[in-house]
Amino acid sequence: MTKSYCAKLWNHQYIHMSGSFRLCCATMDNVEDSNGNRLHINNNSLENTWNSDQIKDIRLKMINGESVSSCSKCVEQESRGYKSMRESQDMEKNFALTKQDGSVDVMPTTMELHFGNLCNLKCKMCGQQYSNQIGKELLEIGKNDKDFLNWIYKESGNVNIWTNNLSVEYKC
């Protein structure tokens, strides 16, 4: 396995609850077009996003063993001795499917699509991005600790408020 390989770029598509395409659930970075505009499900097809310039560039970087900044969470996990999501088989098969420009003719075999964070549970392994109940709890803690609240907003990406009135920012 090359140090930067992740099978998700060959078999998985992730759509954040904001409607933005991302490489996977472990990154906060949105997939963007060549002008730096994020690709959104309302304006972009799955097919075009799957072989967008950014995705093709990242696939080629992975084939060449170059680091990908969007994948820093998994790299950090691995450096601590944990197995990350990107550690997977099929590297040679996926590399063989990749054209010289980084595109592939096969579509993803899995998709993760989130419509919001409305959830009546507060599972310990989850976060405010996926549970408004956890979000309400964190907002309560943040009333007395503004630094904590600023950190939570930064970590949550596009989610503004985690109350029963879900507010998600849609920037197209």
Feature locations, PLM:
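Conserved alpha-helical substructure of the radical SAM core
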Residues: V31-R38, E78-C172
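Accessory C-terminal segments flanking Radical SAM cores
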Residues: M1-E92, A96, M107-T110, Q133
